[in-house]
Structures are given as C-alpha cells and as structure tokens.
Regions:
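Gly/Ser/Thr-rich phosphate-binding loop
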Residues: 1-62, 160
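A structural signal for the hydrophobic beta-strands that form the central parallel beta-sheet
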Residues: 20, 86, 113-114, 128
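Active-site glycine-centered loops adjacent to acidic/histidine catalytic or metal-binding residues
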Residues: 22, 45, 68, 116, ...
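Generic, well-ordered alpha-helical scaffold segments in large soluble proteins
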Residues: 32, 36-39, 98, 105, ...
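Conserved ATP/PPi-binding loop(s) of AMP-dependent carboxylate-activating enzymes
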Residues: 39, 69-72, 79-105, 125, ...
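Short low-complexity, flexible loop/linker segments enriched in glycine and/or proline
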Residues: 55-59, 101, 177
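Conserved ANL (AMP-binding/adenylate-forming) active-site segment centered on the GW(Y/F)…HTG consensus within
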Residues: 61-64, 91-115, 147-151
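AMP-binding/adenylate-forming catalytic core of the ANL superfamily
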Residues: 78, 88, 93-94, 117-182
C-alpha cells in the first residue's frame, strides 16, 4: 500500500489484483489501491465450508471494506451475539473422529458457527469486525473487539504494529512505533 500511495506502483511488478482473505483490512487502504488502478478483491471462507463463503468484487467507497455479499450456494445468518453462521451443501460432515469438536462448530440444524463477528448492511454486504473468542468484556459489560481498536491505532502514521489484549477486565495495548518515535 505504501508503495502505491507514494507513486511507486512499479515496484509491485505486474500485481494489479491484490486479494485479501483471513484478516480485516482498513477500507481506506483498499480504496487507495482501487483508486490507483488496482482491482481489489476480498474473500471470506472457512475450512469447514470447503472454502465456500463470501467474496467482494465491489470497488466503491461504500462497500470496499466488506468481505462481500453472500453466495446463492450458502445460507447466512448473524446470531444475536454477532457471530456469523453459514449453512449449505459444501459444509463438512464433521471433524475426523472428533464428534465433540464437530458439535461445538456445527449445530443440529447444520449451521457452522464461524467464531467471527460480523454485521450485514442494507445491500447485503457482510463486514467482519473480529473474533468472538477475542472479545474483551469490560467491567461495565461492554464488549470490545481488539481487532477494531488495533485498526484504529494502526491509522496513526508512527505506529508500525500494535496488539490489544484483555488485562483483568481492562484493555491493554502494546504499541511499536517507528524507531525515531520510540
């Protein structure tokens, strides 16, 4: 992204279709790449669904941060706690010789509980906000997604890397800055 924004897209060679999956990306980064001639694709899937899931080809500002719209091959729902669930013919039969593990992930109605937190907009685009198991539950009862906080912190130009973790019902942050700002 930095090379693209500094006008050095040529350093990326023939790369013109960056594909992102398995992580949340800053929508502004994706939009910057799209505005600079790249066709950005985001994908979402799971091993338990044989890779089938959601894909986003949208290049517009409103939807570029989404993982996409659902496929006709799958059913999707978001649980009251925000967890994304998927169901369809491509869902695995279960984990090999692990019925307990299978029961934790696939419910009696065939829904795969992904463990990912998401929301869907009025146009049917899904947005991943974090992992259910990573939620920090504060003393006030508020649920905080560390991934969302990390995304906000990483927008600061001097921040190279950061980690947000729970420290006794409070939010703990480790920030690594550029050397000259340490």
């Amino acid at each position: 992204h930095k090379d693209v924004m500094r006008g050095r897209r040529d350093r990326l060679g023939e790369l013109w279709v960056p594909i992102g999956s398995s992580a949340m990306f800053d929508p502004q980064v994706l939009l910057d790449m799209a505005y600079n001639g790249m066709f950005v694709i985001q994908c979402y899937g799971a091993t338990e669904t044989c890779g089938a899931g959601i894909i986003n080809f949208a290049q517009d500002e409103k939807h570029i941060g989404a993982v996409g719209q659902g496929s006709e091959l799958m059913d999707y729902k978001i649980e009251p706690d925000g967890e994304l669930c998927m169901r369809g013919d491509c869902v695995m039969m279960g984990y090999y010789k692990d019925p307990e593990g299978t029961a934790e992930v696939i419910d009696k109605d065939g829904w795969v509980h992904t463990g990912d937190l998401a929301w869907v907009d009025e146009d049917g685009y899904y947005y991943i906000t974090g992992r259910k198991k990573n939620l920090i539950i504060l003393d006030s009862g508020e649920n905080v997604s560390p991934e969302e906080l990390e995304g906000m912190l990483e927008k600061c130009p001097v921040v190279q890397e950061c980690i947000v973790k729970e420290l006794g019902k409070k939010i703990g942050v480790v920030v690594y800055c550029e050397k000259e700002h340490q």
